[in-house]
């Protein structure tokens, strides 16, 4: 008969749980646990609002953070346009359900996950993301929420926090992770700057010109090489 263990016989939490875990270091004493932080739209999947603009024929919905760096200004413009045309959340979701990841994106994410922890840091919304994230194998996604009324009209949005991509990188670094980040637009640049290494991917010329401190590449093969170059581990393609 198995011996009974009483509460008094067990110290909880266990003593080991109170001992800080040692950092996992490489041969030269650098943190060897690395997180790859990626933007979503324009990097792994099409720009959702551009796809919706093409479907509806509403040219003004094509604007993204590549065009309007202030995300609050951009979203208020989008919500106003949706309201003017009587478009609901379901209308946007119907278009999203037809989209596929960019060519090579699924293979790239699989390649990355074999070598890094992978987190998607995006200014998209959970109400948009599921069809595309399913095709990417559901990597971790940190993003925002939309607020709708009882008629499915999008009335507002809830940001996770101010400058959320940079704040996420700061939080990961506080846990002693080393961060390599990739993005394509203005709203990614604070994340890239806070990361241990930042990479522009599929970025337009104006963003590349304004942020020459970041290497800029345009294919997934080039992006793999930049991640290998930025890592403090010996990695291969």
Swiss-Prot record:
Q: Where on this chain does Mg(2+) bind?
A: 39, 41, 184
Q: Which family does it belong to?
A: Belongs to the thrH family.
Instruction: Provide the protein name.
Output: Phosphoserine phosphatase
List required co-factors. Answer: Mg(2+)
Please list the residues that make up the active site: 39 (nucleophile), 41 (proton donor)
Give TM regions.
none
Q: Does the keyword section mention Amino-acid biosynthesis?
A: yes
**Which PANTHER family does the record associate with it?**
PHOSPHOSERINE PHOSPHATASE (PTHR43344:SF2)
Note how many cofactor molecules are bound and how.
Binds 1 Mg(2+) ion per subunit.
Keywords per UniProt: Amino-acid biosynthesis, Hydrolase, Magnesium, Metal-binding, Serine biosynthesis
Q: Name one GO molecular function term.
A: L-phosphoserine phosphatase activity
| Catalytic activity line of the entry | O-phospho-L-serine + H2O = L-serine + phosphate; O-phospho-D-serine + H2O = D-serine + phosphate
Short name of one Pfam family: Hydrolase
Pathway given for this chain reads: Amino-acid biosynthesis; L-serine biosynthesis; L-serine from 3-phospho-D-glycerate: step 3/3
| Function field | Phosphoserine phosphatase that mediates dephosphorylation of phosphoserine in the serine biosynthesis pathway. Also able to dephosphorylate phospho-threonine.
Judged by the first EC level, this protein's enzyme class is hydrolase
**UniProt-listed Enzyme Commission number(s):** 3.1.3.3
Binding positions for substrate per the UniProt entry: 47, 78, 122-123, 165, 187
The terms describing its cellular component in GO are:
cytoplasm
Query: Could you tell me the superkingdom of the organism this chain comes from?
Result: Bacteria
Q: What Gene Ontology terms for biological process does this UniProt record contain?
A: L-serine biosynthetic process
């Amino acid at each position: 008969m198995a011996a009974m263990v009483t509460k008094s016989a067990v110290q909880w939490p266990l003593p080991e749980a109170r001992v800080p875990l040692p950092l996992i270091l490489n041969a030269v004493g650098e943190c060897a646990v690395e997180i790859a932080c990626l933007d979503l739209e324009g990097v792994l999947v099409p720009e959702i609002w551009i796809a919706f603009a093409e479907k509806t024929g509403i040219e003004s919905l094509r604007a993204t953070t590549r065009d309007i760096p202030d995300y609050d200004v951009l979203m208020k413009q989008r919500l106003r346009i949706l309201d003017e045309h009587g478009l609901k959340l379901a209308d946007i979701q119907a278009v999203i359900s037809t989209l596929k990841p960019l060519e090579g994106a699924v293979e790239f994410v699989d390649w990355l996950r074999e070598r890094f922890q992978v987190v998607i840091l995006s200014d998209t919304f959970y109400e948009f993301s599921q069809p595309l994230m399913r095709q990417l194998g559901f990597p971790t996604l940190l993003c925002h929420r939309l607020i709708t009324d009882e008629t499915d009209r999008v009335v507002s949005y809830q940001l996770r926090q101010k400058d959320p991509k940079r704040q996420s990188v700061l939080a990961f670094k506080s846990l002693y992770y080393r961060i390599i980040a990739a993005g394509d637009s203005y709203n990614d640049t604070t994340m890239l700057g806070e990361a241990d290494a930042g990479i522009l991917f599929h970025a337009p010329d104006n963003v590349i010109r304004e942020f020459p401190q970041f290497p800029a590449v345009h294919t997934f093969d080039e992006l793999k090489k930049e991640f290998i170059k930025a890592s403090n581990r010996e990695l291969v393609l």
